[in-house]
A protein has these predicted regions:
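Short, strongly hydrophobic alpha-helical membrane anchors
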Residues: 1-6, 134-140
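Short, hydrophobic transmembrane alpha-helix segments
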Residues: 1-6, 26-35, 51-64, 342-354, ...
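Residue-level signal for short hydrophobic patches within transmembrane helices
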Residues: 1-12, 16, 199
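Transmembrane alpha-helices and adjacent helix-loop boundaries
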Residues: 17, 21, 40-45, 90-123, ...
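Hydrophobic positions within alpha-helical transmembrane segments of bacterial inner-membrane proteins
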Residues: 19, 23, 27, 66, ...
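Transmembrane alpha-helix boundary signature
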Residues: 80-86, 110-121, 169, 215-216
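Short amphipathic alpha-helical coupling elements at transmembrane boundaries
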Residues: 85-90, 175-188, 509-510, 520, ...
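Transmembrane helix boundary and interhelical loop/hinge segments in multi-pass membrane proteins
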Residues: 166-174, 178-182, 499-505, 511
Length: 710
């Protein structure tokens, strides 16, 4: 019993870590209506500033803390509110979530550009160093609470008490909640919604800064990925509190930390449960809470009763353009692909050819996002994990059974489809934020539990996958593999287009408009979404098997980490989540754009070296440009692209395509009109009797028969 109690007490500091992050998320959601996935990125920004001024410039502790937490943290929140989120108050949950996803990608890269990209080892603590033997509790046990743990506990309790008092007993807390529910109605009651919104974001960002500075010493080096993974682990406490209750969130964080510590003390250190289950416990608890917490699945976001109805995104251009243009576009696309293939075959060296092949394969994986996100309206954040399942299935089948690689790729896709179907059955009951969190929890569970297992990934040494022979053609030659990848992409795109234009695609389009209306005409929303999720998983698994075959091994860390999967989602939704063209171009862009930027950023330094007589100020300015900026600049642009989703939910490529198609159709119709043939699809003008009719009472719409008489 004493051992159990000691383990439970040891879990309190860890629970407070979870609780501090979870309370910060709840505060942001409660005061702005945004489930801020970028909370960890904001925490990283403040922690990086604290590191630089405290350790590099040796500022006093107090001034460094004030700058990082009290100045930089709220300043980031104010900037985000003024530039972005003030325009998203009445937007849907998908737009807010995608915007925060873009910020999650962009903010750490901006910090690296501003403060430098060097490794930051041993982040300095926010507290003064104390002797750890002064913090024994109780004195006659082996429990040790050091200064950092005491500071974390004290900060978490203080924050929770202060926020509870703020929301229960202050007018500011009441105004914050009122502005989230309806900015317009709050303004009618004399509330300055602009000022309240700014205050809310500054307060939540201050808490993010405090969490970042306080928790950074838990890691050997300052890394945004560590803070984000810790944030996702804390999401279980957030869901335990229903995304609104701060006391329940605090209790959930404590319970999670205690449970993890009890498991650590009870399980054998060398057992599979200890090495796999304990690190994955927060993600497993999050997944189970999302599925089974009472009332959570029926929770819907609060909508502003005075807000206008949010229009659905326009129909895909491929479904509404004239038939002659569809035929012409596909013929023109085939010519462009043939010319591009010939140019790659004869002009590119091995490096650039490899990037093109990788981009095409990634385009296939991104086509899975077209099915689940574009057509299904479900923000899935686990497609990288499903692609990894296809890659591991391919590698294991080849290694264990000697099966042909092509057959193993197909069966690997079937395995991924089976996993996707099993995941979809419970997950599709969720929607919006909850579905995105459930798929993210699955991705992290897969990474923590299954990837380390030798029968899944091969263990520490990745499984190799040889390139196959197809008759006399050896795919070990990159040029032949390029042709093979293009043919595979064409086949998958045909499947996606057929699905989009078929019955399932029409059902999914109806479900995006209204579940109730779709159900009234006999459409099963659950069955249609399970089908979409399963097909998307199969496509992702097929792409993962192709990627493993091209790379030569099924390597999770280099090809399929969950954070890279989030970048894929951000990149595709910014380009167009319903367009096959956007998927292929996004895959190519992901690999080619950073490489092109690297070449561009290398040129100034090379020029300075080859021109030693250049003016010193020119040499200094050009020499400051570093080639390693390329990755940061590329990811910043990827994140900014996701932020534009709120303005163009159809995607930038789809929006530009719609503009071009409209211009071409108008030009053709004008030409036909000048030739005396009239427009190709004449639309009769509205009847004046209907247009001039008096409106229906209370609707503003004319009646068809009033005005036609008399």
């Amino acid at each position: 019993m004493e051992t159990l109690l000691e383990n439970a007490v040891r879990g309190i500091p860890t629970g407070c870590v979870f609780a501090l992050l979870a309370v910060g998320l709840v505060l942001t959601y409660k005061t702005s209506g945004v489930f801020n996935l970028a909370f960890g990125a904001q925490a990283y920004a403040s922690a990086a500033v604290f590191y630089v001024v405290r350790k590099d410039h040796e500022w006093p502790l107090l001034w460094a803390a004030l700058l990082a937490v009290v100045v930089v943290g709220p300043a980031i929140g104010l900037l985000l509110e003024r530039v972005l989120f003030r325009y998203l108050r009445t937007a849907g949950s998908m737009a807010k979530l995608v915007t925060s996803l873009g910020l999650l990608i962009a903010i750490p890269e901006v910090v690296k550009l501003v403060l430098g990209d060097e490794s930051r080892k041993n982040p300095p603590p926010l507290w003064y160093v104390m002797r750890t033997d002064e913090w024994l509790w109780p004195r006659n046990t082996s429990i040790v609470l050091d200064a950092g743990q005491i500071a974390t506990i004290a900060a978490t309790v203080t924050v929770v008490v202060a926020l509870v008092l703020l929301f229960r007993f202050s007018s500011l807390g009441l105004r914050m909640r009122a502005v989230v529910e309806s900015p317009r109605m709050a303004e009618l009651n004399g509330v300055d919604s602009e000022r309240v919104s700014m205050t809310s974001w500054m307060l939540s960002s201050l808490l993010a800064g405090l969490a970042g500075v306080l928790l950074a010493p838990l890691f050997a080096s300052l890394n945004p990925l560590d803070l984000f993974t810790l944030l996702v682990a804390a999401l279980a406490a957030t869901v335990f509190g229903g995304l609104t209750s701060i006391p329940l969130t605090f209790a959930g964080g404590l319970l999670l930390g205690v449970l993890q510590a009890v498991l650590a003390g009870s399980l054998p250190t060398d057992s599979i449960l200890a090495t796999g289950l304990r690190p994955a416990l927060p993600f497993l608890v999050l997944f189970l809470l999302l599925l089974f917490r009472p009332g959570l699945r029926s929770t819907r976001e609060v909508t502003d009763p005075l807000a206008t109805v949010e229009a659905p995104p326009p129909a895909p251009v491929a479904l509404v353009r004239p038939h002659w243009m569809t035929v012409g576009t596909r013929a023109f696309g085939a010519v462009v692909v043939a010319l591009g293939l010939a140019a790659c075959w004869f002009l590119l060296d091995g490096y650039w050819l490899g990037l093109v092949i990788s981009g095409i394969i990634l385009g296939i994986i991104m086509m899975s996002l077209i099915v689940v996100v574009g057509m299904g309206g479900m923000l899935s954040l686990c497609q990288a994990a499903l692609a990894a399942i296809g890659a591991f299935g391919t590698a294991q089948l080849v290694a264990a059974t000697g099966m042909s690689v092509l057959g193993a790729i197909v069966i690997g896709a079937v395995i991924a489809a089976g996993v996707g179907a099993l995941l979809a059955v419970p997950v599709v009951r969720l929607d919006g934020v909850y579905l995105a969190l459930a798929t993210l929890a699955f991705a992290l569970m897969f990474e923590s539990i299954f990837v380390p297992l030798s029968w899944v990934s091969g263990g520490a040494v990745p499984l190799s996958v040889p390139r196959p022979l197809i008759g006399p053609i050896d795919l070990a030659d990159d040029r032949w593999f390029l042709l093979f990848a293009v043919l595979c992409a064409a086949a998958v795109s045909a499947v996606v287009i057929r699905l989009r234009e078929g019955t399932t695609g029409r059902f999914l389009q109806a479900l995006q408009t209204s579940d109730v209306a779709a159900a009234s005409i006999g459409i099963s929303g659950r069955r249609s979404r399970v089908v979409a999720f399963t097909v998307a998983a199969a496509i992702a698994g097929f792409g993962g098997g192709l990627m493993a075959t091209y790379v030569g091994q099924a390597n999770y860390q280099s090809s399929f980490p969950y954070l890279i999967g989030l970048v894929w989602v951000a990149l595709l939704v910014s380009a167009g989540a319903r367009s096959v063209q956007a998927a292929v171009l996004s895959g190519l862009f992901f690999f080619l754009f950073p490489a092109i930027l690297t070449r561009l950023f290398t040129f100034p330094g090379n020029w300075v070296e080859s021109n030693p007589d250049a003016p010193s100020w020119v040499a200094s300015a050009l020499g400051a440009i570093q080639p390693n900026w390329a990755q940061s600049v590329a990811f910043i642009l990827f994140g900014i692209g996701a932020i534009t989703y709120a303005k163009h939910p159809e995607g930038s490529i789809e929006a530009q395509t719609a503009t071009s198609v409209g211009a071409i159709v108008r030009w053709v119709e004008r030409r036909r009109g000048d030739a005396g043939t009239g427009p190709s699809d004449p639309v009769p003008p509205p009847s004046p009797e209907v247009t001039d009719a008096p409106p229906l009472a209370g609707t503003g719409r004319p009646t068809a028969d009033s005005g036609s008489t008399g």
